[in-house]
Structures are given as structure tokens and as C-alpha cells.
Amino acid sequence: MDEILYKENCLPSNVAQSFSTNIYRLGYIIAKDILPNQHKNIGCVPDDNTYNSVQMVHRVYNHIDQRPQVNPALEPMTYALNIMVEGFGYKMKDVLRLKVNMLQPHPDFKPGNYNTPHIDDEKMAEHFVLIYYPIDCDGDTYLFNEKFNKLKKPEKLTIHKRITPKANSCVLFKGNRFHASSNPIKSEMRIIINCNISLLENYSETNRNTEKDPFKGTNIEGKD
């Protein structure tokens, strides 16, 4: 699968309502979009439009964290993930990482700026990224044409598509595509649920099954 899939009304209304309410009840920690010491990594490509801002994060799950504690949000989020992935005609294999990111306006963040373009995991570039938007806000997700190559950074990034957050919508794309968030300018906050997943091996863009899609509004955009 090497396309960008976008869907509105991607969850049943009761599930979407639960997310849009409970994201305000989570405990968040202060973090950077990308840490300063990561900017030289081959999976990060800052450019003249980059503004690296502070964000608030609620971490739900990371596959490399073997501590026995389980975040109570993991089960309902995994349930919702399965609905969204199957709505695109795929089957999810594993959840690799789950977190909630919150960005707020910054006085130095200008229209056309974005946070550091990156891939989420340089060691697992074959993963998939699903971003769920629980609320309406500004602060587009930037998806670039360029893909990760462990031997060479792209010299320049070109924008393929911008996704404006719309409540109860999601976007799915392969994890080797460079992407970036952007801070809201008009809204008081931008909240998204960021998911890294793997798909079952026998599901590819050639056998994607949408016949049983229970929701309307599937669009296939940006097919390479």
C-alpha cells in the first residue's frame, strides 16, 4: 500500500463522541515535536519553513516499552483503530505506538510554517501511520512527496497534500513518507491521535476490500 487514504465520518457517532470528550480528561506531558539532537537524524528533514514547537503529549502505548502497566485508553483506541483500518479495506496486525498530541498557537508560528518533517521510526520504515482528528481545528498535517531512504536525506521536500483536521476524520499512509504537523493559528488547540501500526501481510493495495465498508466517504488520494 503506497497511497494516501482519507475518510470522513470514520467512526460511529458514539465512539467519535467518546473520543472528542475524553481527550480533555487525559494527563499530558510537555515535549518537543522533534528533540534538537534529532534534527540531524536521517529521518528528519528541517527546512526554511520549519518551526520546531513545544507540544503536549499523552502516551498510550509503545511496543518497545515492556513495563507491565497498561494505559486504560489502549483497549478503546485499539477497538477504534480496527474499525478505521477495516473501513479502508485492510486488517490491522499490530499496534506499534499510540499517543495523543496537542499543539497550541505560538506567536512566532506563521501561515505556511510546519513542524519538523520526519518519519516516526527510522528502524521500522515499513510501518503505517494513521492519524485521527477528534475535533475541528486548524493546523494542517503536511504530507510530502519524498520517502525515507536510509542512505540519503532528501535535498528538498515538496508538499504532496495538506490535511485540515476535521472532527471524526482520519488519514492512513505508509510510514516511509515524510510528514509534519503544524500549530493552530485560529483555534485554541489542535489535538490528534497518532497511531503507528502494521497491517496483515496479505493485505495490499491490489486486494483492498471495500465491499463491506460500513461507512461512507472513502477517498483514495495521492496514489503514487
Residue ranges of each PLM-predicted region?
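Catalytic core of non-heme Fe(II) oxygenases with the double-stranded beta-helix
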Residues: P68-I193, S198-F215
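Non-heme Fe(II)/2-oxoglutarate
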Residues: M1-K91, P214-E221
